[in-house]
Amino acid sequence: MTKIFRYILLSFVLMMLVACGKPDSQKAFEKGFKETMTDINKKMNEGDNEATKMMAKILEKATYKVNKVAENGNVSELDVTIKAVELTKYLSEFMLSLKPLIESNMREEAFTKATVDYFSELSKKDLEYTETNVKVHMEKIEGEWKVINTDDILVGIFGGLEEFVRAPHN
């Protein structure tokens, strides 16, 4: 009797493992999110601009949670919540802190020092976060899942800073 019970239990556990796997589109999204975060970090750490490097440290705090996946053939929609530092608030504060320097015709060195000082202090603070709910649209192209609306994900990563993401890049 115990052998039969073990086989039934083992079969049940095996079926649960197979049934509880993540959909392929979710796996592709998770892999792509990690790659995007790595690319952003890598690009922002190039060169010797300390303020940009500090900003990269702030951005790498972004996380995500996949709430729901609706996969239908070659299309998929993921309901994702991206939690990131609320950059809109902090960049507004930064611009206000620069106002006296701008009015006094600051030099580039003063701007650089003020920027580094601000982001250095910011990295020591307990930062506020914002959550952005994103409907991620994916399509299976040549056997691989691809995100269609990448800008929406970037807005979430940049803490709702839509102007930065959607601005024309030269």
Which residue ranges define each predicted feature?
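Bacterial N-terminal signal peptides that target proteins for export
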Residues: 1-8
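Short beta-strand edge/turn micro-motifs at domain boundaries
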Residues: 131-166
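C-terminal motif of bacterial Sec signal peptides marking the signal peptidase cleavage site
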Residues: 16-19
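Beta-strand elements of well-folded, non-transmembrane domains
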Residues: 82-88, 140-142
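Mixed-charge, low-complexity intrinsically disordered segments
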Residues: 86-130, 168
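Post-signal-peptide N-terminal segment of Sec-exported extracytoplasmic proteins
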Residues: 40-79
